[in-house]
Structures are given as structure tokens and as C-alpha cells.
Amino acid sequence: MAAAGLVTAFGHASYREDDAFHITPPKPLGSLQPDETLSRVSLEAEELPAGVPGEAWVHWAIYRNRPDVGGICRAQPQTATALASAGVPILPLHGQGAFLGREVPVFGDARLVRDRKTGERLAESLSDAGALVMRGNGAVAVGADVGLAAARMWVLEHSAGINQKAAAAGSPSPISEEEFAYWDSVSEEILGRIWAYLKS
């Protein structure tokens, strides 16, 4: 995500393992080494262990609320953040936009999510969508694994750019229900290819 410009000094990623998740340390993702030690957080935890990002509550709450999610990415996509601040919805205007949901939800609290209760509210706002924009505070994307979550974050920012241009040019028209269902059915295949591109 760092190479794609989605994270700078801030951002984190995690993957689920049984009744816990492993999360990156609170340091720039682009500085991590392949042998970097990740922290394990139990999904039954009442408090976060030392050395994890304060916003690990975001991951904790989403994993508890979404059994289908195996990976989460937290990043700072600029265009998506700007559209949320301007009240412009991010809609599926192109096929890959369907990977995010029928409209990307926005979490209205711009403060860092550093407590359990706020994390739970964010997870409720995400619902069954593929991504959520945190107004004034970046975004979070989910996937069956962490690679697909990173790919979905890339799609979020790409889709935000398309929405920005479409809104400036006229009245954006989302893809049809039939088209949405088709693209949703091939999401993992296409997201896998995007992840391969991001790793290249």
C-alpha cells in the first residue's frame, strides 16, 4: 500500500487466525521488513496488549462483527477522504466499484478510533460493505485475506477518483443491479489480480 501511495506515516494491516488477529506495529508500513514481528490480539480481549496501534480496536470490532473477513487494511486514501468531507457519495460507477458495496459507508466521527465502543460503532457502520471511509481520518477495507483487503483499498481510491471526475462532469449513473451482481460474483478473482499488481 505504501508503494501505491495509500499510506505514508500512518496505516496498519491485520489478518485473522482462529480466535485472534495479528496486526502490524505502529510504524510506517513502508518501513516494515519481511521478518517483522506482528502482535497477536485475542478477539476476547478486554484491553489491547502493549505495542499495538491504538486503532487496533477497529480490527477487533470488525473481525467480531464479520466472520467472513480474514484481513483488514487501514490507510489514508486522499481522494476518498476528500469526497467524504465534501458529502459526495462513492458509488459503483464502474465494475470494480461493486467490490465496495452499493455505496461506500462513511463513519462520521473524525477522531482516532482508540476505544472499544467506538470500534464497535464503526463496525456497525461498515455493515456488510467492502470498505468504509472515516470522515477526516482515512479509510478501512476488508477482504477474505489481507491481500484482498489491500486490493480493495486500492479499488476504493481508484473508484473515488472516478466518482470525483463524474461528479464534476455531470450526474453520475451507477452500474445496474444486474451488472453489480455480475461484478460481485468475480470480485475475488479480480481482487487477486490487483493484489498481484500491487506486489509487483
Enumerate the predicted regions with their spans.
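Glycine-rich flexible loops
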Residues: 1-200
